């Protein structure tokens, strides 16, 4: 937990000068990776296909995505089940047991799944959507590799994830709080979301990024994450760069960034015609 969370726990439990024992946040057997893609369904299907028989959790932000992705994997012939709060208690219990006992090695779920689940041989955790906070991501990704064997934690990122999460944050109910307290919590949630967005976009060591967030400061890159191993898509941007430079030159410095960006994006607005 971060210092803020530890302080909240102590305050809630009314602890006076508690002794705090921290075991460390590093999980060396976990390989962290961010994949920026709009073709998430295809990526997930290819990933599961390339890891036959392995146990994995795929987290989605919404029940709708859980239902859609589980149905897609089933159509492709994968033994995949699902879990979210919209299912009956009986269905949740059955699907959870199918996953635990490897009847269905893959489970697609919202963050309602995982608390109290003790399954050591989870080889991968995929996040179909970016979580709202590093705390959530660390906890959910950490369900991989509890047996100490190498396991992968892959986060699929697109700009749409930020929009979805902001929408979900806007729906949070602060009715029982006064306006000042509610505003503080909204700002906190937004800052946490921005931290996750930076994680998805950084080229720095992903493990060190996570550890630094939780107050640890490694002195060297881990050598075992997507950033350290250069798991990036290389795209030749030469033509695009020339196009942008020509566009700037054609505008002769007479217009601001809004007009420039609109022109580059091909926006159909009156001022650009």
Regions found by a protein language model. Give the residues of each.
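Short glycine-enriched loops at secondary-structure junctions
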Residues: 64, 159, 210, 266-267
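Helicase motor core with emphasis on the C-terminal RecA-like subdomain
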Residues: 1-180, 191, 215-218, 227
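A short, ordered amphipathic alpha-helix with a cationic face
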Residues: 154-156, 183-186, 196-199, 233-235
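Pre-recognition alpha-helix immediately N-terminal to the DNA-recognition helix
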Residues: 43, 195, 243-246
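Accessory DNA-binding and partner-docking regions appended to nucleic-acid-acting proteins
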Residues: 163-164, 175-181, 188-190, 206-208, ...
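Flexible coil/turn residues that form the inter-helical turn or adjacent wing/linker of helix-turn-helix
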Residues: 2, 203, 253
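Structured, non-catalytic alpha/beta "coupling" segments that mediate domain-domain communication
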Residues: 195-218
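Short, surface-exposed helix-loop/turn micro-motifs enriched in polar/charged residues
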Residues: 22, 122, 202, 236, ...
